Amino acid sequence: MERTKIDILISGGGIAGLTAAAAFGTAGFSVICVDPTAPVTERNTDGSDLRSTALLQPARDFLETAGIWAKLNPHASPLQTMRIVDAGGEVAEPRLTRDFDASDISDRPFGWNLPNWLLRREMLARLDELPNGTFRPGVGTKTLLTRRSEALVSLSDDTQVSARLVIGADGRNSPVRRAHGIGARTTRYGQKALAFAVNHPIPHEGVSTEVHRTGGPFTLVPLPDYNGMPSSAVVWMERGARAKELYELPEDAFNDAMSERSCHLYGPLTLATRR
């Protein structure tokens, strides 16, 4: 069996795994990152991750050190204001609103929002620039044997890696965690989240808005304009059964439902991606 000797093996090619790979590679370590599923790096491709990630100031500085931020900056939406809206009651309407402005504590925004599919695309581009960094899509972790000075990892392509450090960045059902016998406890809250992007006629002006009602928050996070209109990423938390009902609605009915749930703060919302 072919064996490769490296400093670090990372199992998982999501945002956490690719960030670690780029950071360690930039620091001079030899790195291999594997993932059984190739990341989807286009917005409208089936399987793309339509969630977004808000990178706060320390994360932005870390990504700059890892050589990634210069690639992300042109696509990032600054988060200047955090707005909390209490819309409880029979009718979805704002009853209490509180704004928190980043200028009260810093000369920079709270953070910057980016779509997850785009984060993966730019992180892969950074990893591709590094002579000591390798990404291997379609390859997963099979077995893990730890010794005093190294870990021997067998991969799904029948190769083996000897690494000084193994990082499990492979999700809640982590093969690395299970291979090493590390247990986990699962707590279920009876909620599910719908994630998608929307267009709206009223600009968000860098405001991230959480609208709170029974069932969970409805959060709009700024994105760059899309198709000439203001755009936001949405995470809509609801009880499981209600989330399923919403997911199965025809698009026009879904647009109406989410516009009402948002209290029409940005005008009528229309889907800009699948949900």
Predicted regions and their residues:
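Conserved N-terminal helical subregion
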Residues: 2-4, 75-179, 187-192
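N-terminal Rossmann-like FAD-binding beta1-loop-alpha1 element of flavoenzymes
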Residues: 6-33
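Conserved Rossmann-like nucleotide-cofactor binding loop
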Residues: 16, 39, 173
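Glycine-rich FAD pyrophosphate-binding loop
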Residues: 25-49
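N-terminal FAD cofactor-binding segment of flavoenzymes
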Residues: 47-89
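Short helix-loop capping/hinge motifs at secondary-structure junctions, enriched
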Residues: 91-92, 201-205, 226-228, 242-244
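Conserved FAD/dinucleotide-binding core of flavoprotein oxidoreductases
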Residues: 105, 214-275
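Central beta-strand plus flanking loop segment that forms part of the substrate or channel wall
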Residues: 173-212, 216-219, 238-242, 258-263
